[in-house]
Regions:
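Non-cytosolic beta-sheet module surface loops
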Residues: 149, 158-162, 207-209
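Beta-strand-rich ligand-recognition modules
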Residues: 167-219
């Protein structure tokens, strides 16, 4: 018997119930399905908005369980193919609705949105899918977050790195595209100069991947290339 389980034997039933919920163990409540643990790459969001990390990377996201899109390699991820694949309709409200944590959308199969805080500057999509027992290869991931700016910010740039190809929209407008087979590199592609509105700004992203790992990172930089950290992010 390992030490991990020795100390559980004498725990009260209520404590065991709570522990099961946190770790993805069966809760013991009839009809209740515990959410698998997404540690160490993610944590469940806590109430209230959060801020980017000290380097400006946005870590709070709503992630949709992966959409099946078979690709045996990433070599065919041309701009034309990626744009067709990522702008095709997969679920209602794809480009317009603000999803909610736990919301299920009807794609080819039901898929659930998860509100998460990444523990790394790069959001590890492969780990997300694997932890949920979902496909990790030949898939499309959708990500949404809300950036709340204390004032209008002009001449900023969105910077993105992704593995593999991806497209990103700011307030409904395509802002960054990363095409071809690529590794995730921070600040891999910078947008043209854009404006963050005072108040809420909606970011949507779609990442396509064949075989291999998949992740992304997003931040905003000012006209001098300095990371913007005075905004807040949330998923509601």
């Amino acid at each position: 018997m390992t030490g991990q389980f020795k100390w559980r034997l004498g725990m009260p039933a209520a404590a065991l119930l709570a522990l099961g919920t946190l770790t993805g163990m069966p809760s013991g409540v009839k009809g209740q399905v515990a959410t698998p643990s997404l540690a160490p790459s993610f944590q469940r969001v806590t109430p209230g908005a959060t801020t980017p990390d000290r380097d400006g990377f946005l870590r709070r996201w709503l992630l949709l369980e992966p959409i099946d899109k078979p690709n045996r390699s990433n070599s065919g991820f041309t701009a034309t193919y990626v744009r067709q694949a990522l702008t095709a309709p997969y679920f209602p409200g794809q480009f317009t609705a603000l999803p909610r944590d736990g919301q299920v959308v009807r794609a080819a199969q039901p898929l659930r949105w998860h509100a998460l805080d990444s523990t790394n500057f790069d959001v590890k999509l492969f780990d997300f899918a694997k932890a949920l027992g979902k496909p990790t290869y030949g898939v499309i991931f959708w990500a949404v977050t809300i950036v709340d700016s204390p004032r209008e910010m002009r001449d900023v740039r969105m910077t993105v790195g992704s593995n593999s190809a991806s497209i990103w929209w700011l307030n409904g407008k395509e802002t960054v595209g990363l095409f071809n087979d690529r590794r995730m590199v921070m600040d891999d592609v910078l947008s043209d100069r854009v404006t963050l509105r005072k108040g809420r700004n909606v970011i949507r992203g779609a990442v396509i991947n064949g075989p291999g790992l998949s992740d992304f990172c997003v931040r905003f930089v000012d006209a001098n290339g300095r990371p913007i950290t005075e905004v807040k992010t949330d998923v509601r």
